[in-house]
Amino acid sequence: MKAAVVGMLNNVGSSTSHHGGGYYHVMMNILKAEHPGELFFNPDPSTWNEYERLYILEGVNYQENVFNFIGGPQPEHRAKLEAMAKYTGLAIAVNVPIDLNVFNKRFGIDHQFTSINCIDFAKLYGDTTRKLVRGDSHSLSVWKPGYGLDRTDGKTLFGFLKDADTLIDKWNEKYDEVILYFGNIDLRFHLMRQENPQQATGELFRRYVQFAKKLNNATLVNLLPVEHESRKLPGTGLYLKQPYFGTRQQRMELRDTANRIMNNSGLNTLQWPDEWIDEDGMKMFEYMEPKQSVHLKPRYYMFSDQFIK
């Protein structure tokens, strides 16, 4: 079956320097594994009817039917929409629903678009392989081929553990292996605001370990080294209008506590290179994406050599 992967807002990217590119690399790998044939990426909209199936893959920050046209709607957006109006094959939204009638409000094309089926391939793939990566936005950086992905941006470890025990039986039926990656958000924004940060960190990560030990085969990921305090974050990345709470040194000490608990638990753990750590955290800027962000460049993902060419 001849199929293509396209984006309505932006073309499917392949950057190895930006978080968004990491998402595309992960999803391209999953789609290639799930699709029974060759996939083509970003063909010209005038050729879309040559493909029996179109996978519509929007970017990492896309939310259902929220269309942010950077610089305003462009001719290429209209060309894609007009191509979809003429498309006679099967269109599938990847992971997040898309309503082209909402998209069309900015263009006014005389066409009523039919509903597009949405399939969460990221999670579905894990159902097939019985392997899952579960975490916050950082979970992209520890995804590896053969694993599904269940990503909740902004999810804290504290929040995840609130109802985590309800997942145990379900996960043990569905998955033989699970990689868990939470905690960086707690370290940045929450732990240093507790009455006794060291105690709070210890209690939180011991609960994490206890949960993970109830799963068939869980792997925990160590927290990232803390970058220099001069790192700028976008407004959407702030909490209570602050980029972090606690000094870098204080947070590095809590990181050491958290990682020690995980590494001494008897569970499998994934650890970031010690070479990333220097005296003041400036070296981390080499490994983080160049824009204002807390994320790694995809080329430094834990298993990048297995799926990013």
Name these PLM-found stretches.
Residues G21-I30, H35, P43-F107, D165-H295:
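Alpha-helical cap/lid subdomain in secreted, periplasmic
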Residues C118, A122, D136-L140, K144-D150, ...:
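Conserved active-site regions of diverse hydrolases
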